[in-house]
Amino acid sequence: MALLEVEKLHRRFGGLHAVNDVSFQVEPGQIKAVIGPNGAGKTTLFNLLSGALVPSSGAVRFHGQEIQGRQPHEIAVRGMARTYQNIKMFSGMTALENVMVGRHIQGKAGFLASMLHAPWTWPEEKAIRDKSMALLELLEIADCAHTPATSLAFGQQRAVELARALAMEPSLLLLDEPAAGLNIYETAEVGRLITRIRDLGVTVLLVEHDMSLVMDISDEIVVLCFGQKIAEDLPSAIQQNSEVIKIYLGE
């Protein structure tokens, strides 16, 4: 059974069909990419999947259950985590503390009680701290754990953001332009981290403009144009698709 099923998804803004009859599936263990130029509907699609927007029609099934119309936190608890194009670090917090925020969704004490350091939260807080530190080690940025997150290099902040998303223990990770703002070396490193995340059993769906990264790490690619799906295939086939080459990749 597919982990994520998108069926005839449609979202209108007045007379604009931002997402128009889009269908595809994401299988467990895949890295699947969604590409297209600005205005293609990629961000709107992610907002529909993660609960930030409600579709005008169509269905989204996650683990076999329909989730369209549910609140983002309800979808997150079910196992879907998301990162954003613009990195959102909590100012005044270290890299480790930023990751711990993501981990609190798995806790029972509640974020506020933990922030107030209530004694009965201490055992759980230690477990959250240990797990968050392990994620920083996994993504090879443990040496930055106690550094203010906003002072880190852009590529390091992206890794912290990935660790924070993984702290939620998702089965599906939505990555919104993970290479945005990164140089060629940082982009290659992010690609390596995404592949490592997939190898750990987390399915990945990403939106990305960097075609080299997409072609290198994706198992399948969905191509959008003005809100409609115009292609879905293996990277090698997408590279040979004449319509995709003409509209998106350049001849």
Question: Where is each model-derived feature located?
Answer:
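Glycine-rich phosphate-binding loops of nucleotide-dependent enzymes
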Residues: 1-251
